């Protein structure tokens, strides 16, 4: 999204077409994902043609001369194409997610078959943490709306983290397993410290939502959260990003 004057206009970069075409023409064929890409590509090109016209139209300030006459038609065309784009884009994202799940399942099976129980449980744990963050994102929870989050879904995701965390701690308590996978207690301690920070932030996050359920509308409106407060969406994501960094260090 770019702004021309005070008017926001979507700009689609050409590189996205190159990436889709490269994936479609790849020697590694994935039928469902390739088909989703093939459906998405022409619609995306249509959308780019309209958005490029909008950028040109507003960039040259033609809207000031014709009283937005052409602009109205461009916006009408954009909305028609965007509806088709949204449907194809959602299908494409679903296929990407499915492929990602398949790939992760193969990785987990490999770890399990080779007896790498620490890596196995660590991968499940980080996926559980990612799932919690995804549920926050799917509910579009922000600093001002997060206390309205779906408590049931979020608590279930939190419970998955706690179960995965407990299994991971059991795995790293085995001295023979540590030696087999070439891990030291010092390296794992760094990860565990950040894991505790993330779990604490998630716990506070959940408690804030629970408390809001018994608050009146006026009490909720008076409640003020700052970005650096523990348990806010920003804090959860900040702690999660640090955890992912420590996870990557462990896996390398």
Where are these regions (language model features)?
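Post-signal peptide N-terminal segment of secreted/secretory-pathway proteins
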Residues: 1-66
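Amphipathic alpha-helical coiled-coil segments
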Residues: 10-20, 54, 80-93, 163-171, ...
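Secondary-structure edge/capping motif, primarily at the C-terminal ends of alpha-helices
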Residues: 23-27, 51-65, 99, 103, ...
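A short acidic/glycine-rich loop-to-helix N-cap element
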Residues: 66-76
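Extended amphipathic alpha-helical interaction segments
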Residues: 75-195
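A cross-kingdom marker for long, charged
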Residues: 153-252
